[in-house]
Amino acid sequence: MADITEYLERSMQNCSLIDRRSSMGDGFGMSDEHIPISDRFLELSSHFSVPSHLEQCLDLKTGEIYYRSWNSGMRVKEDPRKSMSRGNYADQSSGESSGTVFSSEEVSSYYESEESSSESSPSSRKYHKEEQDEDVLVVAGCKACLMYFMVPKLFKDCPKCATQLLHFDQLHSTSP
């Protein structure tokens, strides 16, 4: 197992998203000197979320990151998170505001009030729980094809062979 891991690590070290030269060998005996340091790493800024109407994509041919709008399909190369933060600072310094800014207390109180109003009746609570279960992905294993899958919580059959899946979240879930 250690040999396989070591082999994969060496192979991945020789990969470059921007350099079009590819190594068909196993990666042994190659030096990293031919790959510039800037080509080895790609900053995704994944610790900040992308606005909900955009999708962050990677062009595998060029190695460039671009953003695609789900509404219009337009591609933008500039990171919208950076332009939004610059725009907000500019608006605040000029005294203008492009939208309503809520404090974290206001947002949390809004969500708490939404939860309490939607959970007022038992039928709405049951519907709300079923709706939440549809959106949750869980790990499930198939005993027949010996594979693991990420499937919606309410999904019971293996997507490959249609036998019953073994859900690994059942230890933590409460059943009625």
Curated annotation (Swiss-Prot):
Secretion signal, residue range per the UniProt entry: none
The WW domain, residue ranges: 48-82
Keyword Membrane tagged: no
Segments carrying motif EAR: 41-46
Region Disordered, annotated ranges: 77-106, 111-130
Functional summary from the UniProt entry: May negatively regulate the cuticle development by interacting with the HD-ZIP IV transcription factor HDG1.
Subunit structure: May interact with BHLH122/CFLAP1 and BHLH80/CFLAP2.
Protein name listed in UniProt: Protein CURLY FLAG LEAF 2
Gene symbol of the encoding locus: CFL2
